[in-house]
Amino acid sequence: MAAAVRKVTSPAALQESSLKYGEPLGDSHLRRVLSARLMALGVPAAPGQIITTVGATHALDIVSRTLLKAGDCVMVEEPGWAVEFARLDALGMRILPVPRRADGPDLDVMARYCGLHSPKLFVSVSVFHNPTGYCLSPGSAHRVLQLANAHNFHIVEDDTYSHIAPEHATRLCALDGLQRTIYVSGFSKILAPNWRVGYLAAPSALVERLLDTKLLATLTTPALLEKAMAWCID
């Protein structure tokens, strides 16, 4: 980490980067590294489909503000991260809790919600779900994707634990190929949580809308920290 910071804050590097804003999508070196990492997980995300964020929480917020409006129904696994419930509630969303089981979300509950409430989004932690530690089974994953296609809702997959999880673990974004799914992750669980470097990977058709939401909130993200992170993980 110290070596990466020294590299991006050298006089030559600072002269090049300090007098301009960062790239709207995020540092291109970091996005190339992340693209290769996602490809290894089976998630087909080109650098142009990746948007860097101020941590994974910011990525989740961008998705919500882009795809939802106040009053929309959102399915969220329960138990789950209290901040996610609070964040969606603050945005005026109607939260539909889905019990999390050992092999994935309760599919009967999801199907019932789909029939009664027409949810717009499902928020899921497929791998090392917090707090249960469970991982999604292939069978449950395929059924979740079938429900999403049949009832026209998007899925945001929070893969915050990806860097300590097996690459072969079942991920909705890999099975779906980033068609109806959006991938979210960050580095707080393995490296420099106070750098607040996160990212999302989305279907090409959604990238411009998601980027607009990012730009309206933060304009860009901290370029020096993104460059340092790229050197750390490359």
Residue ranges of model-derived segments:
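PLP-dependent aminotransferase class I/II
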Residues: 182-183, 189-234
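Conserved core of the PLP fold type I
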Residues: 16-152, 163-175, 182
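Amphipathic, well-packed alpha-helical segments that form the structural scaffold of globular domains
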Residues: 6, 10, 35-39, 123, ...
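A generic short alpha-helical patch detector that favors 3-5-residue windows
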Residues: 26, 114, 176, 202, ...
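Glycine-rich phosphate-binding segment of PLP-dependent enzymes
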Residues: 1-20
